[in-house]
């Protein structure tokens, strides 16, 4: 592979302060908001939530008592049809709907909360921590890759992945990888890896960002 084609060119960019999701979300999921495990109070897109409220509450009631101290532990995720709840904290589930949609639909949904997809520049900065090395761990592959890549911003970036993360531009920034990719395919672990073509939303993921503006 010609590295000049497989990697984005080196450049200098002014990076604004940002809020960014620690974990990436599957691209075929629309995040509606989050619900408290103790009070059942939902915060987020109430118009979209109203249609699935009964199913969400049924999922939580099936899980157990309202008393958090009575729980042996909340499941990491709960699913019913196209509804998915993910444990977001000790007291909240993130509420999502599994969708068959286009990237433009996802971008529109994110804008409801003031979020968007990162640009290519922002993605590379967030994934690399501002470092210029080829990989997050340096310029050479270790004999055994960790389960997650190191990240100075505390982002959760798994080595094993079904696809890459979406960015604002129509460029693929990674690809499907096993837990221990070969030296040839491991180039897709680089924050600066790129390939042409639209991403497959059924296997891709996305990380919400919001630019912080200081007046």
PLM segments and residue spans:
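Extended beta-strand/loop cores of jelly-roll/beta-sandwich
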Residues: 1-116, 200-215
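Glycine-rich loops and low-complexity Gly/Arg-rich segments
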Residues: 10, 43-48, 141-144, 189-192
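Glutamate identity and glutamate-enriched acidic tracts
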Residues: 12, 29-30, 124, 165, ...
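Functional-site microenvironments in short loops/helix caps that host divalent-cation chemistry
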Residues: 79-188
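A detector for short metal-coordination/catalytic motifs
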Residues: 178-213
């Amino acid at each position: 592979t010609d590295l000049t084609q497989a990697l984005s060119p080196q450049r200098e960019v002014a990076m604004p302060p940002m809020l960014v999701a620690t974990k990436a979300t599957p691209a075929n999921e629309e995040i509606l908001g989050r619900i408290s495990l103790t009070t059942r109070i939902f915060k987020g897109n109430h118009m979209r939530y109203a249609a699935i409220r009964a199913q969400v509450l049924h999922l939580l009631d099936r899980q157990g008592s309202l008393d958090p101290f009575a729980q042996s532990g909340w499941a990491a995720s709960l699913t019913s049809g196209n509804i998915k709840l993910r444990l977001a904290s000790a007291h909240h589930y993130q509420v999502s709907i599994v969708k068959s949609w286009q990237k433009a639909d996802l971008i529109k949904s994110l804008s409801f909360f003031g979020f968007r997809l990162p640009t290519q520049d922002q993605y590379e900065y967030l994934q690399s921590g501002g470092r210029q090395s080829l990989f997050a761990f340096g310029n050479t592959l270790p004999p055994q890759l960790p389960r997650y890549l190191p990240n100075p911003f505390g982002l959760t970036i798994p080595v094993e992945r079904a696809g890459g993360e979406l960015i604002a531009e129509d460029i693929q920034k990674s690809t499907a990888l096993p837990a221990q990719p070969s030296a040839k395919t491991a180039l897709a672990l680089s924050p600066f890896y790129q390939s042409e073509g639209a991403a497959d939303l059924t296997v891709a993921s996305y990380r919400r960002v919001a630019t912080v503006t200081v007046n």
